[in-house]
Structure formats: C-alpha cells, structure tokens
Design a protein with these regions (language model features):
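STAS-typified acidic loop motif
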Residues: 12-48
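Amphipathic alpha-helical interaction surfaces in cytosolic regulatory modules
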Residues: 42-114
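Polybasic, Ser/Thr-rich amphipathic helices
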Residues: 1-8
Length: 118
C-alpha cells in the first residue's frame, strides 16, 4: 500500500538506470493530488500523462506536489501544460512545493507564469 492507501505503481527505470518516477495519487472528492518522486522526463512522462487522462473527466482540481521531483524535462513540462489545458474550462490546476532545480526550469522556460504555483 502506498502513502495514500492506494497500490503504488512505479515506472520502470530506463536502460541507463537514471529515469525513475514514483507517482502517488490521492483523491478527495473531485480534487486529485499527484505526489511525484524522481524524474519527469521523456521516459517517465507518459505514465503521468495517462493518469491525468484517467482523472480529468471527473476532476475539478488537479494538484501536483513536486517536493520530491529531482528533474523535469520539456516532455514533463508538456504533460503539465496539457493538464492545464484539460482543466481550463473545468476547474483549476495547482503546482506546489517546487524543488530548486525544478523551480529554475520553470523560471527559465517561462512556465512559472503559466501555472498557479503554491
């Protein structure tokens, strides 16, 4: 069992052993929180994208807790941007607890202006 009482699913590491993402999901009514641990990159972003696509039909709020995210690539940014677009007419999306490396990427790319950051 995972932190939120759900079965944990983990992305398989890449052949280089460097790409790994653990996604913990919590649902509270129509609010979904995703706690990301590891790297959100080309290898791991499809798993998060699939989870987002599963919940957006019922979601009024998506929260991404990035307190344990070590790295985010352009592929990861695209997934978060897609989530923002999916929630545009339905509710809100929040990104919180950015680590320093992830915060730098958000600032350098201008994504810090696109998201609600807590």
């Amino acid at each position: 069992m995972g932190l939120f009482g759900k079965k944990e699913k983990k992305a398989a590491p890449s052949t280089s052993g460097k790409s790994y993402l653990d996604i913990k999901e919590n649902k509270d009514g129509a609010e979904y929180t995703f706690l990301l641990n590891g790297r959100l990159d080309t290898i791991t972003s499809p798993e998060l994208d699939a989870k987002i696509n599963e919940v957006t039909p019922d979601a009024e709020k998506l929260i991404f807790d990035l307190s344990n995210l070590d790295y985010i690539s352009s592929a990861g940014l695209r997934v978060l941007l897609g989530a923002t677009q999916a929630m545009e007419d339905k509710g809100e999306m929040v990104v919180r607890n950015l680590t320093e490396p992830v915060k730098e990427v958000f600032e350098l790319t201008g994504f810090s202006r696109l998201f609600t950051i807590e």
